[in-house]
UniProtKB/Swiss-Prot annotation:
CDD domains: SSB_OBF. This is Single-stranded DNA-binding protein 3. Residues 1-103 form the SSB domain. Gene3D superfamilies: Nucleic acid-binding proteins. The gene is ssb3. InterPro entries: NA-bd_OB-fold, Primosome_PriB/ssb, ssDNA-bd. Residues 112-134 have a biased composition (Polar residues).
Amino acid sequence: MNKVVLIGRLTKDPELKFTPGTGTAVASFTLAVDRRFKKEGQQEADFIPIVVWGKQAESTANYMSKGKLMGVSGRIQTRSYDAKDGTRRYVTEIVAEEVQFLEWGSSNNNSMANDQFNNGNENGSMQLPDNNDITPIDDGDIPF
């Protein structure tokens, strides 16, 4: 089994690229994930590289920015490549299968989307519509 679940903060804005040929979106970013234990009263964090593909990559790049809290679930993957100096380099990263935006907003001027989500509330909770437009249903009308 290869399954990872993380909650952390973005260390910088996600970097969005598109693959040559197919044009598939891929976003990469680093999550700062707090450790459970404090060393000498100081909170320590691990900085974990994340890669996300497709529509989730585009959404992540559009709506998330440095410092925002997000959740990621996926798998650990190790890959290698040849560097310009001729040495072989190894990279261990998380390939995200699911991302959750735990804080909204972006420095890329996406405040309109954030305002629509928040629906005008300062605390970020959504307002439910008034019940004036709801038609009452008789239990006898339900087929089960």
